């Protein structure tokens, strides 16, 4: 049986995760409470990724191995409470994607200077000859780069 992943949110993070999960053999369902961009829907259709927009249908989420919640979606909404009560693990894009790569990860966090620090670190490593990516709030989503 194929593992199912539900992705809440079809923005940059959700889109990248959906494509990566599909490439790794997951049954993917993307649910977005807002309209999904036409180009994204066309891409999902081409890849065989099921999706819905303007709603979240709980019955379509049951049986999922994971639910990846995009960072822009609050954890304090009834849908998240319901998914937790069904004991479906909620994961972030970073958590899900890190399971599918052997790459060494460097995370840069904090209140100030993250973009500058990330760009400088990327430049130093690239100049030193390492095969590096710059992902997150700069560049592509992590999932898209993997």
Model-derived regions: residue spans:
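N-terminal leader/targeting and accessory segments in enzymes
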Residues: 1-92, 96
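Phosphate-binding loop of NTP-binding sites
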Residues: 20-23, 58-62, 71-146
């Amino acid at each position: 049986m194929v593992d199912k992943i539900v992705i809440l949110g079809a923005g940059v993070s959700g889109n990248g995760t959906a494509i990566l999960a599909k490439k790794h053999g997951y049954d993917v369902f993307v649910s977005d409470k807002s309209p999904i961009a036409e180009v994204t829907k066309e891409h999902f259709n081409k890849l065989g990724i099921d999706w819905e927009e303007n709603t979240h249908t709980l019955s379509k989420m049951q049986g999922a191995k994971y639910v990846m919640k995009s960072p822009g979606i609050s954890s304090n909404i009834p849908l998240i409470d319901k998914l937790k009560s069904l004991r479906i693990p909620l994961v972030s894009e970073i958590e899900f994607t890190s399971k599918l790569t052997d790459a060494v990860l460097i995370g840069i966090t904090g209140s100030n200077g993250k973009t500058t620090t990330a760009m400088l670190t990327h430049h130093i490593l690239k100049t030193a000859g390492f095969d590096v990516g710059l992902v997150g709030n700069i560049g592509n989503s992590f999932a898209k780069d993997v």
